[in-house]
């Protein structure tokens, strides 16, 4: 009986120590899983009824992505974000800005960044931006 108690105590101690050192694994509900997620201490971007979805002018595929995102947000929140074509380098606030970035390694890769003023979704291609939207 004493050996059984010692074995149970040793097992409980091992489990307690293991649970103290185990890292929590995030459960992101996106496919494919992001390769990297970085958190900052900045205030979050707050979606509101005046949010704008911007995309580069003369890019019909990103315009279609912007319209898709607008419809998605409207279904989820009842906000109806307007979409707007913007010139290269034009700055907008309270916006979700879609764009292309040829430095992204994967053709279907994307980088999503948030600030208190807005969200940027950049992809190497329009498909990458679409995956970032999802």
Kindly give the residue locations of the regions a language model identified.
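Bacterial Sec-dependent N-terminal signal peptides
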Residues: 1-29
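Contiguous, structured surface segment used for ligand recognition
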Residues: 20-134
């Amino acid at each position: 009986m004493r050996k059984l108690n010692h074995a149970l105590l040793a097992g409980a101690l091992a489990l307690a120590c293991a649970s103290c050192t185990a890292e929590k694994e995030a459960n992101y509900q996106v496919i494919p899983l992001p390769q990297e997620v970085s958190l900052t201490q900045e205030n979050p971007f707050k979606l509101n009824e005046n949010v704008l979805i911007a995309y580069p002018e003369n890019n019909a595929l990103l315009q279609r992505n912007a319209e898709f995102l607008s419809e998605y947000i409207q279904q989820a929140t009842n906000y109806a974000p307007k979409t707007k074509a913007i010139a290269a380098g034009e700055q907008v606030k309270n916006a979700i800005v879609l764009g292309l970035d040829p430095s992204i390694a994967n053709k279907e890769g994307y980088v999503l960044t948030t600030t208190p003023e807005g969200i940027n979704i950049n992809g190497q291609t329009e498909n990458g931006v679409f995956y970032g939207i999802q």
